[in-house]
Amino acid sequence: MFSFLKNHPFAVEAFFESSLVLTFAVAKEEVQHLIPECLELDTFRDKWAFIAVAMVQTKSLRPKGFPKIMGNDFFLIGYRVFVRFTTSAGKNLRGLYIIKSETDKKKMEFFGNIFTHYNYSTTDIIQNKQKEVTEISSIKSGFQIKIENPADENIPLPPSSPFADWKEARRYAGPLPFTFTYNPADKKVLIIEGVRENWKPSPVKVIDYQFSFIDQIHLSDVTLANAFIIHNIPYYWKKGRIEKWNKAGKNSRAF
């Protein structure tokens, strides 16, 4: 009855205290089944598709325009595939398709699942920050990541990364401007646009990592392609908009 509420009916803003994103390269044939028919994989050299894990510490997350005191602080984890979508106007949008979402608080799970299609679940988050190393882990979700705190950008790309340099790697750093959700029953695509300024993520050296969810997808060859972090950035998401998808490529704007 109130399913329309899941379509991001209002803009939302937050302050990102930190956003750490690890991007993994996978052969495109192995990722295709993870995305809906309306989207295309955003590939590199027509060979690699990408799955990113984003870990974001938000502050004062709230409907846009509301006072900060009404906001809440949450830790958010998102597993996303890099994709493209062609709009009814013929624009080719780069964005993300979310395949799993987690948070550290039940309140975010509750309201997130009312106002989005992201199917949040609550998990434990353990953060251990020392002078040179930051570790983030979860017992329930079975993940652990340890990085060196960036002192400069003169660090090497991860071994076996498909990118030649960090400049090339930044194209797949995330988050991208758009996030997409698809309803196969009525062939409608929900488009969420994120807006930020001064987005200049810094490369980080990953000491160790393990993500049970990535293991559970059963991909045969997953390679860490890059890792970036950014601090203290205001961010907001516009109200969602919907387009009717036509397999022949003639999309129509719904509202």
Question: Residues of each region from the PLM?
Answer:
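Low-complexity, intrinsically disordered regions enriched in charged/polar residues
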Residues: K6, F10, A25, N92-L93, ...
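Short linear motifs at secondary-structure transitions and domain/linker junctions
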Residues: F15-E17, A25-V31, I51-K59, G71-F74, ...
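Interaction-surface and assembly-scaffold signal
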Residues: H117-F255
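Hydrophobic, proline/glycine-rich low-complexity stretches
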Residues: M1-K64, V195, W199-S202, Q210-S212, ...
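Aromatic- and glycine-enriched beta-alpha-beta binding-site module
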Residues: S60-G142
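Aromatic-enriched hydrophobic runs in primary sequence
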Residues: F10-A11, V31, A54, T58, ...
